[in-house]
Amino acid sequence: MSYNKNNIFAKILRKEIPCKKIFENDHVLSFHDINPQKKVHALVIPKGDYLNLDDFNNRASDKEIVALSKAITEVSKILGISFDTGKGYRALTNLDEHGGQEVPHLHFHLFGGEKVGKMVE
């Protein structure tokens, strides 16, 4: 899999496709998933052209890496699913074919608002 600048997340970042934005800063955008799998289902993506987590960790600046990590926590707070609520959430990213990655742009799913269930079936 290689990075495709016409993937849906790249189009959202270029504002060619609308999204229901939750959070944004210089390095990260978060928005609601259009096909939620749980009561709360958000996506958190870096603004750079990163294919997956390995690509991101190898090429992103320290500032981008910290921004993405902190954004996940900030989004969980905005959505009311953060650790301090006592409920929690699952943060998930898929990597390549065997990992189930469908969109060739690094993205984290945040699932919550209800019990998430088993990790892998």
Predicted regions and their residues:
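HIT superfamily nucleotide-processing domains
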Residues: 1-121
